[in-house]
Amino acid sequence: MKTKKQQYVTIKGTKNGLTLHLDDACSFDELLDGLQNMLSIEQYTDGKGQKISVHVKLGNRFLYKEQEEQLTELIASKKDLFVHSIDSEVITKKEAQQIREEAEIISVSKIVRSGQVLQVKGDLLLIGDVNPGGTVRAGGNIFVLGSLKGIAHAGFNGNNQAVIAASEMLPTQLRINHVLNRSPDHIQKGNEMECAYLDTDGNMVIERLQHLAHLRPDLTRLEGGM
C-alpha cells in the first residue's frame, strides 16, 4: 500500500497576494522539499505580469537568518513571486526581554530636579516631585505621587494609550507619544489626583484620575505592582 506523502505547505490566495502556512512540526529540510514540490507543480500569476506578494506564516517555528534567506530565495526562484513578510509565533529571548521591560512598572523614590532626566522603558511610578526644568520619560505610563511641575513624556515608543497622572498636576509640558501640550491651560481643583490621556480624536485631555477606570481598564494591573 502506497503511503500518502505528508503535505507541509498550505497556500491560500487573498486580495493581498498569497499566504503560505508552513507546517511547524516537520524538519526544516522536509519543509523546503515540500515547498519546492508545491511551487514546481502550481503556477501562480496575477494575469497582469506583476509579481505576487507572498506572506509566510511559520506558526510555532523559529528560523535563523540563514534559514529565512533560504526560504526567501526558494520562493523568489519562481519569477512571479516575492516574499513580503515572514511571521512566526515564536519570539527571541531579546524580544521577550523587551516585552517584559516595556510591561514592567519601575518604582523610583526621588526628586527630579532641574536639568535631570529620569527615563524608563516601561511604566514609571515616581514617589516624589518633578521640579521645573526636570524631565520624566516612560515608554508606558507615568504616575507621580507628588508634584509634577516639570516635563513629562509618556508613551515615547509610540504608545497612544499611555497616561500621565500626578498628585499635583502643574507641568510646564506634557507629551504622550508625539502629541505635545505646553503649559496646559488648566487649574487643578482640590487635592484629587489628575491624569492626562489622548481621546479618540488624538487630543490631550486632563481629567480626575477616576475617569481612567473605564477609559483604560487595563491599568488595574498597577494594583499588583504598587
Curated annotation (Swiss-Prot):
A Pfam family recorded for this sequence: MinC_N_1
Domain of life where this protein originates: Bacteria
Keyword set includes Cell cycle: yes
Annotated signal peptide: none
Transmembrane segments annotated in the record for this chain: none
Gene Ontology biological process terms in this record: cell morphogenesis; division septum assembly; negative regulation of protein polymerization; regulation of cell septum assembly
Disulfide bonds: none
Keywords of the record: Cell cycle, Cell division, Septation
Family statement drawn from the similarity comment of this UniProt entry: Belongs to the MinC family.
Role, per record: Cell division inhibitor that blocks the formation of polar Z ring septums. Rapidly oscillates between the poles of the cell to destabilize FtsZ filaments that have formed before they mature into polar Z rings. Prevents FtsZ polymerization. The MinCD complex plays an important role in asymmetric septum formation during sporulation of B.subtilis cells.
UniProt cross-references to PANTHER family, sorted A to Z: SEPTUM SITE-DETERMINING PROTEIN MINC
Complexes and interactors: Interacts with MinD and FtsZ.
Name the UniProt record assigns to this protein: Septum site-determining protein MinC
Organism per entry: Bacillus subtilis (strain 168)
